[in-house]
């Protein structure tokens, strides 16, 4: 894709995001569609997210436990492991699962509607496809991402705690005490904010690629692949920005 085409596509995407933002305040609210999409996204995301979060938490605990022992700071294993899961691993795992499972399904659904000309028919009938289809999916993805991030964080921290205590001989009291000493409420909030933003980004990219799909069934498949890849890239870039802003704005305990 050439430079002008990339800029044009980026402009169209941001215009699409603005249209979706305007649609958030419009009535009537598509409650039925929202509930259906929230249930669908959660049903395809809960089990994979829970299963992935266990090894994530375990690997983080094992790696950090080994590192802090080499540095002579074994008492801080709990703080390092829990903060890594809550701030970074939890939202990232949540976003990747939602983008891979829920986002691909959203893109495929809207892409199929596009090639069957259902979206054009809705516009002819005076129905805004963005308000009717995109807004409920974005809101559902945001809600599920926030709730799922809580589950992933709990499972990941529990897995890290278990592996640290059982496999590395850590002390349960020291594991929890170090987190209490260095952790703070904004650490939990930033994880939820990340999950909220990641869920919105995943749904917006998937919806945009689906609604602009063309070329028949093959085009829909290509749009799904592109949406997943673009979402992963956007999530890591967004994670860097949010993390950088967080460390600049929120003073850290013990610093």
Give short role names for the model-derived ranges.
Residues 2-32, 209-214:
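Short, membrane-interfacial amphipathic segments enriched in basic
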Residues 42, 46, 50, 89, ...:
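Selective transmembrane-helix segments that form parts of the transport pathway or gating/packing helices
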Residues 81, 85, 125, 129-143, ...:
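Short hydrophobic alpha-helical segments within the ABC transporter permease transmembrane module
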Residues 77-120, 205:
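Hydrophobic alpha-helical transmembrane segments of multi-pass membrane transport proteins
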Residues 39-93, 97:
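Active-site cofactor/substrate anionic-group-binding motifs, chiefly glycine-
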Residues 51-58, 142, 146, 150, ...:
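Generic alpha-helical transmembrane segments of integral inner-membrane proteins
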Residues 63-87, 153-196, 205-224, 245-255:
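Membrane-interfacial helix-loop-helix connectors in multipass membrane proteins
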Residues 110-135, 217-220:
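Short cytoplasmic-facing helical segments at TM-TM junctions of multi-pass membrane proteins
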């Amino acid at each position: 894709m050439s430079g002008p085409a990339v800029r044009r596509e980026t402009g169209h995407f941001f215009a699409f995001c603005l249209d979706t933002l305007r649609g958030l305040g419009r009535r009537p609210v598509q409650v039925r569609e929202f509930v259906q999409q929230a249930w669908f996204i959660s049903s395809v995301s809960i089990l994979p997210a829970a299963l992935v979060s266990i090894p994530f938490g375990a690997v983080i605990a094992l790696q950090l436990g080994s590192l802090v022992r080499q540095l002579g700071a074994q008492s801080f294993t709990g703080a390092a492991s829990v903060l890594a899961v809550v701030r970074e691993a939890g939202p990232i795992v949540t976003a990747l699962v939602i983008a891979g499972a829920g986002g691909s399904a959203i893109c495929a659904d809207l892409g199929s509607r596009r090639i069957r000309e259902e979206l054009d028919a809705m516009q002819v009938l005076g129905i805004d496809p963005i308000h009717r289809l995109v807004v409920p999916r974005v809101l559902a993805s945001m809600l599920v991402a926030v709730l799922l991030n809580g589950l992933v964080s709990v499972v990941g921290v529990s897995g890290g705690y278990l592996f640290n205590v059982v496999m590395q001989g850590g002390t349960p009291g020291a594991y929890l005490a170090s987190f209490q000493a260095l952790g703070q409420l904004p650490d939990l909030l930033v994880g939820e904010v990340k999950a909220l933003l990641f869920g919105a980004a995943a749904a917006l990219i998937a919806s945009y690629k689906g609604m602009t799909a063309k070329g028949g069934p093959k085009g829909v498949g290509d749009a799904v692949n592109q949406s997943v890849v673009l979402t992963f890239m956007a999530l890591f870039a967004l994670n860097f920005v949010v993390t950088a802003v967080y460390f600049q704005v929120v003073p850290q305990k013990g610093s």
